[in-house]
Amino acid sequence: MRRTGLAAVLGTMLIAGCEADTPIATSIVFDGESHTIDTGKVVCTRQPNGGGLVILAQGKSSQLVRIQLTQVGRITVQKVGLRYNDDVTGFIADPQEVTGVKVDDTYTVSGRMPPNQGESGWHTFKIQTTCRGYQDAVPHDTVPAIGAP
């Protein structure tokens, strides 16, 4: 009986270890065009004092998605910023323009972003990514530095 339990625990650890190395695909649909960031670098950080969650998905140097949201009963997306190479960029900080859904640990946010400088029309977008785990943000040091007033 003990060997069976040990084998089950070791098997679970092995599967979890392998899964952690598999890339996470963050999908982006921007103005109807699909893009994907394949990365193992999706960092999901819980902010202190009810500040919500920040999701950061980074691919190559010019591929980035950052989502800030809160959840009190329902998900409210506070801010979304994205860059996919140089042709797909945008930022929105208006929760009225963005919706968010969470199923298990997969987040989907969609909405519209204002035009960038030199553009005339708003952009539509949909982003989907998965948080494999969550970390707590390091709180700011409240002890003043030596010599500080």
Residue ranges and their predicted role:
Residues 19-103:
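An ectodomain-focused feature that recognizes extracytoplasmic/extracellular
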Residues 29, 135-149:
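N-terminal low-complexity, Pro/Thr-rich disordered segments
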Residues 14-17:
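C-terminal motif of bacterial Sec signal peptides marking the signal peptidase cleavage site
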Residues 1-10:
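N-terminal export and membrane-targeting signals
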Residues 46-47, 74-75, 127-130, 146-148:
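Short, low-complexity, polar/charged sequence segments that are solvent-exposed and flexible
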Residues 83-134, 140:
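Extracytosolic low-complexity repeat regions of secreted or lipid-anchored proteins
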